[in-house]
């Protein structure tokens, strides 16, 4: 490890730091010692550290944040995830961007009132094809004559394919939709393969509910508001109010008493005090500060999502081996990421069967904590697995909703949101025991 001396902090800041070895720097004027680490392996991982498997499938923990130099990670190492909590010898790891990124691979719709009398009947089903968007439900109406479930399923498949072609869907999209006979339950199952819509994953990925069970407006997760940088780690109502004076929303319609989708930014103090559209807020909250606290700092449990699961491991055991048929006549795992994690466990020596599983309430709550995000964000950004900016003037440790955190850009004064813990990128949770 190199040891260097600088006359001042300005000289140190101006110097080019090494990218392949660690360095200890002494600032002569202040006698400050600064350690610049590069890919430092540790046996005592903490939140934000990056987890790899070496070429022998051994777990390697590397110090996160500014210590990571992705370009110089050994090519034989596989990036597994990030440490998001540590309790004694137990280490929690988020698995990011692994061999299979999806929680859920199929969406199914049951047609239960199939008539098998050989006469002609008409049936209409509503499906979300993602055309023109995932909020659009398309009616598929067709006639069928069937004496068996298989005949009804074939007619349904033909109707779906024809409707998709009419809508201009690609051949790949058409191939994802089909229907098959569920003889045991005397019904037809309409199936969509390769489910990747973010809203579908966001809810179904953790609870396995179907589109029909999803709320029209899913509940948002709110956390502490305020700006965090490496220079000013202040998170409080006063800062929020100061920013919202000019940066808050000016409502153009009546404000609900709790934030809804699209209303992630609080109204301005002036609007709260005098706008006709804030009458509900003034009647509910005595002060603007109370409005901020109740709407933007208190975290309410979600009706859906990972907070509905008391035990992620129990859910994993229930769902890991569930299969679904394929249009080509084979079978596949319905929850491929869960199967991969729970059944294969990455082949790590000492990692028992089933150590990887879906987050439950405890794991999910930890993932939503702002202090966890503060530690994870620099490492995630350094590894380039999600779009989080962690420069000193741009990171903001506030929950916007279940997937997003705010980014405050100190250069232009604007707020942005980016995925941090994302149901497409974040798969199962691992609980590992260190020696």
What are these regions (language model features)?
Residues 11-45, 147, 346:
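Surface-exposed ligand/attachment interfaces on beta-rich extracellular proteins
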Residues 159-167, 344-347, 367-370:
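Structured segments of extracytoplasmic/periplasmic soluble domains
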Residues 61, 334, 343-344, 361-435:
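C-terminal, surface-exposed recognition/capping segments
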Residues 50, 113-204:
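Extended, beta-strand-rich, solvent-exposed assembly scaffolds of outer structural proteins
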Residues 27, 36-37, 52-54, 61-64, ...:
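Beta-strand-rich, repetitive solenoid scaffolds
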Residues 134-136, 347-353, 401-403:
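Short, solvent-exposed loop/turn segments that connect beta-strands within catalytic domains
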Residues 151, 155, 159, 336, ...:
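Extracytoplasmic/secreted proteins, especially bacterial periplasmic and envelope-associated proteins
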Residues 3, 10-22, 48-110, 201, ...:
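Short, compositionally biased
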């Amino acid at each position: 490890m190199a040891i260097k001396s600088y006359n001042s902090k300005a000289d140190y800041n101006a110097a080019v730091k090494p990218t392949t070895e660690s360095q200890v720097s002494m600032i002569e004027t202040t006698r400050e010692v600064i350690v610049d680490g590069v890919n430092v392996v540790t046996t005592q991982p903490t939140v934000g550290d990056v987890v790899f498997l070496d070429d022998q499938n051994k777990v390697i923990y590397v110090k996160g944040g500014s210590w990571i130099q992705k370009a110089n990670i050994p090519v034989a190492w596989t990036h597994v995830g990030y440490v998001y909590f540590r309790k004694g010898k137990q280490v929690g790891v988020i698995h990011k961007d692994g061999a299979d990124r999806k929680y859920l691979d199929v969406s199914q719709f049951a047609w239960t009132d199939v008539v098998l009398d050989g006469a002609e009947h008409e049936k209409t089903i509503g499906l979300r094809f993602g055309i023109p968007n995932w909020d659009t439900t398309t009616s598929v109406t067709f006639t069928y004559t069937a004496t068996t479930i298989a005949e009804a399923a074939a007619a349904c498949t033909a109707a779906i394919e024809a409707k998709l072609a009419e809508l201009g869907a690609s051949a790949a999209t058409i191939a994802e939709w089909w229907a098959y006979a569920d003889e045991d339950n005397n019904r037809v199952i309409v199936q969509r393969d390769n489910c990747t819509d973010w809203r579908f994953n966001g809810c179904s990925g953790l609870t396995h509910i179907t589109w029909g069970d999803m709320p029209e407006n899913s509940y948002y997760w709110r956390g502490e508001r305020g700006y965090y940088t490496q220079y000013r780690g202040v998170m409080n109502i006063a800062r929020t109010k100061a920013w919202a004076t000019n940066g808050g929303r000016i409502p153009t319609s009546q404000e609900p008493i709790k934030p809804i989708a699209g209303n992630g930014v609080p109204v301005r103090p002036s609007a709260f005090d005098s706008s006709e559209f804030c009458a509900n807020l003034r009647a509910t909250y005595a002060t603007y500060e109370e409005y901020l606290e109740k709407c933007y700092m208190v975290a309410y449990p979600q009706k859906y999502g990972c907070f509905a699961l008391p035990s992620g491991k129990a859910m994993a055991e229930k769902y890991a081996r569930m299969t679904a048929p394929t249009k080509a006549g084979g079978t596949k795992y319905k929850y491929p990421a869960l199967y991969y994690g729970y059944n294969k466990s990455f082949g790590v020596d000492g990692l028992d069967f089933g150590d990887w599983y879906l987050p439950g309430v405890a794991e999910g709550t930890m993932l939503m904590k702002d202090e966890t995000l503060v530690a994870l964000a620099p490492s995630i950004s350094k590894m380039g697995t999600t779009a989080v900016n962690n420069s000193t003037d741009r990171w903001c440790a506030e929950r916007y909703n279940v997937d997003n955190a705010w980014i405050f850009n100190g250069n232009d004064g604007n707020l942005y949101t980016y995925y941090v813990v994302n149901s497409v990128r974040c798969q199962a949770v691992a609980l590992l025991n260190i020696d």
